[in-house]
Amino acid sequence: MNIFPAIDIIDGKCVRLTKGIADDKTIYQHSPLDMAKTYQDAGFNTIHVVDLDATLGKGNNNQVLSQIRRKIDINIEVAGGIRSKDAIIDKINEGFNTIVIGTFAIKNIDDVLNFDDSLIEKLSIALDIKNNQIASHGWQETTNQSLKHIIDKYNNRPIHSYFVTDVANDGMLSGLNMETFNSIKKLTDKHITIGGGVKDLNDIELSRSNGFNNVVVGKAIYENKISINSLVQFNA
């Protein structure tokens, strides 16, 4: 199992949202690049970076993302507002290792399924769960498509992974909703990254014992609920 520390960015600053609500955010003093360097120096092998401005359709932080990619040597999983094939290719060409797509993957399933293997192998399909439905467009909309329908489609292609977020718990420090995550795990043999609500090391232990591949941790680090050094010990 691996821990992916999260860096969420709005207006060039590190933030954490509560339940995916843009107006309910906490801004932190460290710059995204400083946090990325901290995680690299601590020994993590992957960081999860989200451009929330792009997610919400309010501009982007491309310069910040590019700076992080240039100065950080470890793997970077990038997410946020990546809603076209060209945008995916641009991120790959910049050197990002895994590209997380949600809205585009849900709204344009057939297009994504037809990508060449070399491209689709770089993709993590985001499944943002909100009120038992899949959310899109910065968690502002939900789709009537079932989780099973979407997962069945992508199970037939060599995607990198699924990225599952429990939006209701995200930023709440309320603990992982293992019932939701385990229900998805039953639908696929692909790698799964989970996140949303990690509050302590018990959540990490629970994730490992349930066989999840990666866990994203954000607010629990920023709020000093879990030490960086203790998290690194869980990396495979």
Question: What are these regions, as identified by a protein language model?
Answer:
Residues C14-G59:
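N-terminal beta-alpha supersecondary unit
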Residues G12, T18-D23, I89, F96-D170:
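Conserved anion-binding
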Residues V64-Q67, L147-T193:
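Active-site/ligand-binding-proximal alpha/beta "capping" segment
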Residues D41, H48-E94, M178-N182:
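N-terminal active-site wall of soluble small-molecule enzyme domains
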Residues Y28-Q40, S84-I89, T142-K153:
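Short, acidic/polar
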